[in-house]
Design a protein with these regions (language model features):
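DNA/chromatin major-groove-contacting recognition/catalytic segments
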Residues: 241-248, 332-334, 353, 357-374
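Active-site/catalytic core of tyrosine-dependent DNA strand-transfer enzymes
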Residues: 89, 177-182, 238, 262-314
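N-terminal DNA-binding module of tyrosine recombinases/phage integrases
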Residues: 9-110, 274-282
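C-terminal catalytic core of tyrosine-transesterase DNA break-rejoin enzymes
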Residues: 145, 201-216, 303-308, 322-346, ...
Length: 374
């Protein structure tokens, strides 16, 4: 790694060329040339370039497991704890379990395509596979940002696609019609023989009549209800490793919202609150559905299955009560912007892409209007 004296000078100061020869992780030879003025500056430049190359070489020998630890430590200051925990679980189960010991400089397209094929063979929905890819891509983008690798090799193999999935969005959407919900609700009410059981009855009523998310409903306190208005200001998560229940902000800025409570739900909440008030230590800080503590996700799902079975209804997910709320409003022709607002969607396109097929067909009415122009 010599320093060459050049013919040219600048203001009487000798000009030097610093030349560094090195081999990259693929075994290819490279040469780096830099110019310095004065022998002291040239030696300093040489030392710095050697240090940077060695540091870069060592970084490229970092394993994916080691990278993930640094990545998660950096991300914890940028995203919500629940988001980070979900990303960690996805990467641990589907990336690090397969590639954790692979060095960054050995992570090539062939190895990544093999990984992608393995994930494709798992019984995952397309969205889940794409979420895994997205988190993996984000981690490798971090490696590029930190100059551990020159480019993201995952981009070469591309995201997951499902060319055999011809199911339309409406075929995938599950929800209860108003008639089905009333059957479900009747069973839930009949089983509500205690204050806690009433909490489950109230939970499903809130889900259907407001379209709120599970975590938002579970986080609700009586202080969040003023008259006939429900204020969505927080959420709770129950799947963060090493923790019980964590209260978090809502999913996004649009999720902070006020929802007018319809009368059927208001009647249920008033009766439920009267029952809770009889409990020792009641306060406005009580959770609407759980009282002192939030209802457990597993318990909510168990009740959901039991009520559906008793009512002779197909089982739908907790999140599908949100779809039930939205589908009812769509079928009644409610403006898509209002539905997006009630659901707390950050983009109206999300609401439209999910529910537009539920709107009443306007073709016949459009033709009638045009037929009048003669």
């Amino acid at each position: 790694m010599p320093i060459y004296k050049m013919d040219k000078k600048k203001d009487g100061v000798q000009k030097y060329r610093v030349r560094i020869n090195y081999t990259d992780s693929k075994g290819e030879a490279h040469q780096m040339d830099r110019v310095a003025y004065g022998l002291a500056e040239a030696k300093e430049l040489e030392a710095r370039l050697i240090f940077e190359l060695n540091n870069k070489s060592n970084s490229s020998k970092m394993t994916l497991q080691e990278l993930s630890e640094e990545y998660f430590n950096a991300k914890k200051h940028e995203v919500r704890e629940t988001t980070l925990d979900k990303s960690r679980r996805l990467l641990n189960s589907n990336v690090l379990s397969l590639l954790g010991e692979v060095r960054l400089d050995k992570l090539d397209a062939k190895r990544l395509q093999k990984w992608k094929n393995e994930i494709s063979e798992k019984d995952f929905k397309l969205k889940t596979r794409q979420n895994i890819y997205g988190d993996f891509r984000s981690m490798l983008n971090y490696a590029v940002k930190m100059e551990y690798i020159p480019k993201n090799p995952l981009l070469t193999v591309g995201n997951f696609k499902d060319s055999y999935d011809f199911t339309t969005p409406q075929d995938k959407l599950h929800y209860y019609t108003p008639e089905q919900y009333l059957k479900f609700s009747a069973v839930a009410r009949d089983s509500a023989r205690s204050v806690k059981e009433w909490g489950y009855f109230a939970f499903f009523a809130i889900a259907f009549y407001t379209g709120a998310r599970k975590g938002e409903i579970n986080a609700l306190k009586w202080s969040d209800i003023e008259g006939t208005t429900m204020h969505i200001r927080r959420s709770v998560a129950q799947k963060i490793k090493g923790k019980d229940i964590v209260e978090t902000p809502p999913k996004n800025k649009s999720s902070y919202r006020d929802i007018v409570i319809p009368q059927p739900l208001m009647t249920i909440l008033e009766e439920h609150k009267a029952r809770q008030k009889a409990m020792p230590g009641f306060s406005e800080d009580y959770r609407v559905c759980g009282g002192i503590e939030c209802l457990r996700d597993t318990s909510i799902e168990n009740k959901n299955k039991a009520f559906a079975k008793a009512a002779g209804l197909p089982h739908i997910r907790i999140h599908d009560f949100r779809h039930s709320h939205a589908s009812l409003l769509c079928n009644e022709g409610i403006n898509i912007q209002e539905i997006a607002r009630r659901l707390g969607h950050s983009k109206i396109e999300m609401t439209w892409n999910t529910y537009s097929h539920l709107y009443p067909r306007e073709e016949e009415r459009a033709v009638q209007i045009l037929n009048q122009i003669k």
